Amino acid sequence: MKKLTLALAVMIIGFGASAQVLNPVSWTFSSKKISDKVYEVQMVATIQSGWHLYSQVQPDDAIAIPTSFSFNQNPLVDFDGKVKEVGKMQKYSDKKLGVSANQYSNKVVFIQRVKLKGKAKTNVTGKLEYQTCNDEKCLPPKTVNLSIAL
């Protein structure tokens, strides 16, 4: 009976360990006031060692899914330009497969400049989609909802 209980316990622990979700990127969101009505919305990706997060802009031969941002319309906010990337971009190339990618390791900051139309407090809301890979595998794309107070 003890052997059966031990075997079941080992099996359950084994299944639990294999079912763990890998999440090699953590996100933080904030806003920085630039002037009276101008803010920078900052989306910071902290990437675990050995993993890569893909840039929004990829070469033509890339198969990686680029990071993308989709902001909800807000009558109190104007979006000023595109999301900028601040970090050390790496250009990856695999000549055997004939593919390349623009990617980040460790940390990258995505910045969207916005202008308030009035004095009311509001949030920038939306979602981001990204994919991460290491040298052995790529994880399926993930979507993260965001809400950032201005």
Where is each model-derived feature located?
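Bacterial Sec-dependent N-terminal signal peptides
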Residues: M1-L22
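Extracellular/lumen-exposed scaffold segments
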Residues: S18-L150
